[in-house]
Amino acid sequence: MKIQLIAVGTKMPKWVEEGFKEYKRRFPHDMPLELIEITAGKRGKNADIARILQKEGEAMLAAVPKGNRIITLDIPGKKWDTPQLAEQLESWKLDGRDVSILIGGPEGLAPACKAAADQSWSLSALTLPHPLVRVIMAESLYRAWSVTANHPYHRE
């Protein structure tokens, strides 16, 4: 099973790129983690945010390979602790499809992305900086994998 993070935003700080790459490197070969960056719409004082969200959503959905399970990151989504995320990861593997996780921009996700989702996941009730979410996602998914593989990374 392949996991894709499809995220709005490019040109992240070096520490974000390095943090993501560190966890990506740790994933097993049979479960690669990939990051696809979507260019954010130009936001200005008089920007049409609804139109920007629509365009970003179209680009995100176009990046999802046909047949993939789509999971959105959204505050009202399901909240999973590490053991629950590990159970989800196992469930996704048994489903036999690759997984695309959509991470919206500053205003969140387009309605079309939410409508296309098989599941919605709430990483936190907190508002998190979008660059940091990439690193948190990579670490959380790696930790969940480590639980399923009885790897010593996760300790309770």
Curated annotation (Swiss-Prot):
Localization in the cell: Cytoplasm
Primary enzyme class: transferase
Alphabetical keyword list: Cytoplasm, Methyltransferase, rRNA processing, S-adenosyl-L-methionine, Transferase
EC number, as in UniProt: 2.1.1.177
Pfam family, one: SPOUT_MTase
Main localisation: cytoplasm
Function: Specifically methylates the pseudouridine at position 1915 (m3Psi1915) in 23S rRNA.
Entry similarity comment: Belongs to the RNA methyltransferase RlmH family.
Name the UniProt record assigns to this protein: Ribosomal RNA large subunit methyltransferase H
Species the sequence originates in: Vibrio atlanticus (strain LGP32)
